Amino acid sequence: MAAAANSGSSLPLFDCPTWAGKPPPGLHLDVVKGDKLIEKLIIDEKKYYLFGRNPDLCDFTIDHQSCSRVHAALVYHKHLKRVFLIDLNSTHGTFLGHIRLEPHKPQQIPIDSTVSFGASTRAYTLREKPQTLPSAVKGDEKMGGEDDELKGLLGLPEEETELDNLTEFNTAHNKRISTLTIEEGNLDIQRPKRKRKNSRVTFSEDDEIINPEDVDPSVGRFRNMVQTAVVPVKKKRVEGPGSLVLEESGSRRMQNFAFSGGLYGGLPPTHSEAGSQPHGIHGTALIGGLPMPYPNLAPDVDLTPVVPSAVNMNPAPNPAVYNPEAVNEPKKKKYAKEAWPGKKPTPSLLI
């Protein structure tokens, strides 16, 4: 396999050596700047990893001006079970601790050793997979009381530094898994290209009528709002005096509706009022020699206009019998008995 070009006009190719193999799981680099741990780089998936400024050609990008585009290569030896670092003719060099490496010469990197690239202040420390089992307890005094505590730790390291190291490693491992899952999913799932069938504007020659009432005058504009109902009509009676009687009786009922007897229209006349004020037709009485209708205290509302009846100003003299006893007796009013709704007439309880 070939790598990309380095700085300068020459284009050296990195050929993967035949002794390169896949590293053991959990092998990683701790990236430290000063006293702060920045990140962990997992290096257990490939035979070799490239470092440099070119993000398209390198596995790990070094964002520093002193580094070359393809600066160095980290290779795992499958027979020696060791990691080797190769400088790819960089301008400012690759360092193992404070020792600068010779170009194109593999150099073994022991575990827990630190390397750096160019003038970058970031240090890369080679680490193995953190041990999840607790370290052996030294001394017979700690065996009794701390066994329960060690069981409660569930395989976590005792020291806080080791615990932080394990946490960072798990975080980097999970981040790599999520990245690989997304990349593999993008490779497997190919989005189908969207086909544009009707990308051009076409005009139809046929005219489509949306509102037929604008074209056809026989079609009504409000045809959807019209409802049709069939009402059967009774047969009319034969023309004759009988038909006139029905019409006259209906008109008389409408005319006599307004001239009801009123509140006291249904009361029988008293003995004193029988002779002096006889009732006329349709609730009228002679008051002061003039026929006047009783006032209706609760008239019904009728929407049809009622023609008022003409009052005769010169009535004919009423041949009523004059009774002098009725004049001297005091007049008494009679009130209608109130009828309770739902009350049934019961015989008097008094015997």
Curated annotation (Swiss-Prot):
Keyword Nucleus attached: yes
Segments of this protein annotated with the region Involved in PP-1 binding: 200-203
Region feature (Interaction with EED): 143-224, 310-329
UniProt entry keywords in alphabetical sequence: DNA-binding, mRNA processing, mRNA splicing, Nucleus, Phosphoprotein, Protein phosphatase inhibitor, Repressor, RNA-binding, Spliceosome, Transcription, Transcription regulation
Limits of the FHA domain: 49-101
CDD domains, alphabetized: FHA_PPP1R8
Motif interval(s): Nuclear localization signal 1: 185-209
Motif position, Nuclear localization signal 2: 210-240
Positions of post-translational Phosphotyrosine modification: Y264, Y335
Disulfide bonds: none
Primary location: nucleus
Assembly description: Interacts with phosphorylated CDC5L, SF3B1 and MELK. Interacts with EED. Part of a complex consisting of PPP1R8, EED, HDAC2 and PP-1. Part of the spliceosome. Interacts with PPP1CA, PPP1CB and PPP1CC.
Further comment found in the protein's record: A synthetic peptide, NIPP-1(191-200), is able to inhibit PP-1. Alanine substitution of Val-201 and Phe-203 in NIPP-1(191-210) prevents PP-1 binding (far-western assay) but do not affect PP-1 inhibition. Phosphorylation of Ser-199 or Ser-204 prevents PP-1 binding (far-western assay) and reduces PP-1 inhibition.
Protein's recorded name: Nuclear inhibitor of protein phosphatase 1
Organism of this sequence: Bos taurus (Bovine)
Underlying gene: PPP1R8
